[in-house]
Amino acid sequence: MKPNLYICHTAYQVLVDLLRASRTDGQPHIMVLSAAVPEPQSLAKKLEATGAVKVVIVDETRWPGTVTGPFAARRARRAFEKLCGWRFTRAAYNEVRIHNDWSVLGRYLQDCHAGYILCEDTFASTLGPDQHLVTDQRAAPDFAGKQRTGKGYLYWGDSPWCAKVE
């Protein structure tokens, strides 16, 4: 069985995904830690000692922004891989889970047409009564075109490359 891929930006997400990984066949799974997680090297050693995951640390701050123009998704993918030092291969994983699809890693997954699962904490907090991000995104004039073609980025589960929202 293929391992799952878990992408984490916070200690809470690491805890949730470590619990998932330890209860799911296919171990060791792969956990990508954003360098935004406090003390990622130290944490990576502790996580790997559990046997549930192998850890890859990705420093998203190396990616300066977006790419536009012809073949933008392909060019953005290649630039991310070169600058951040990690390459995603969809066929290597069973499930791909991310908590923040509006992050650099989330945009990279969209560029890779990843078919990811958006985990619960970000989506639920975005839909609170005073949150306008999702409704504003859906009201944008180019929303339907982005959903139909997959060109450009959509967040909070609206991307056609998001397979499911938990």
Q: Model-found features: residue ranges?
A:
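Active-site and donor-binding regions of nucleotide-sugar-utilizing enzymes
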Residues: 5-151, 156
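Catalytic cores of histone-lysine modification enzymes
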Residues: 2
